[in-house]
Amino acid sequence: MNKKSDTPTSLYEKEERGENIMKKKNFTVLLATLALGAALLTGCGSQESTADDAATAETTETTETTESADSAADASDTQELETIKVGASITPHAEILAQVKDKLAEEGYDLEIVEYNDYVLPNTALEDGELDANFFQHQPYLDDFNAENGTHLVSVAAVHFEPFGLYAGKTSILDELKEGASVAVPNDTTNEARALLLLEAQGLIKLKEDAGLSATVLDIVENPLNLEIKEIEAAQLVRSLPDVDIAAINGNYAAEGGLNVADAIAVEASDSLAADTYANVIAVKEGNEDSAKTKALVDAVLSDDVKTYINDTYGNAVIPVF
């Protein structure tokens, strides 16, 4: 019989072939496992990367939005206010204006107050465009100034009345005035007339019947004591007191000089022609009556808060008329 027998050598070869086959299978499984693991890791990494990218983008967008909002807020905070420049005598006009500075700032305006100690420069500065408004004078003075100087200024609001008073210099009682006593009065036309009317009301002089608010020393028709009328610039009247017997002084300059209307020898009556005529006004150049600046200024000044301030601060020396 020619059947091939299984020798030891043959058995060994079979076993060796079997082991090689198993190694190949195991290696294939290992490769597949590694490939699957790599795929899973790659997928997770991709998802994490995408999530990280999204989070980064969201953070960046939020930061940019916040920075944009902060920038807008900063720009709003630092936005320049539009200036309203107003000329005024110190007392009470500049002091009254100071009360509305914060209110105007809330409305977008920076109130700049320029103080003057005379009655000419505030009007020339307003006419020349150096000011947006002024606040120091009454209507008769404004009308007279326009007529004499060819200016174009108009009143936009009446604010308060300041009673004119006779104040003691060398003499403290009117009945003690002697022959030839000196009396200081303002040297501008309208305020001089007002002073003369006050002297007339006290029986010290008599004026022409039609003199009225245009009265000057030339309109004096009776002067029993032969009083010496000294015409002095209004801002200097308080300083003149040591050199004269009495002086007729505007309410604002009296207050500025430390005088109290309660201490005056005589004061304009509340029902006098002066009280009806001499309210102090806010003035602007013609053509600016309805400007946004003018309206904002007038609304701020003609308020209950300002009225209360005037009454509490000045008493009978300054009387609101609005």
Role assignments for model-derived ranges:
Residues P163-L174, Y278-S291:
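A bilobed periplasmic-binding-protein/Venus flytrap-type ligand-binding module shared by bacterial periplasmic
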Residues V156-I205, K307:
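A conserved helix-loop-strand patch within extracytoplasmic ligand-binding domains
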Residues M22-Q47:
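Sec-dependent N-terminal signal peptides of Gram-positive bacterial secreted proteins and lipoproteins
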Residues I113-T124, G212-R239:
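Short helix-initiation/N-cap motifs at beta->coil->alpha
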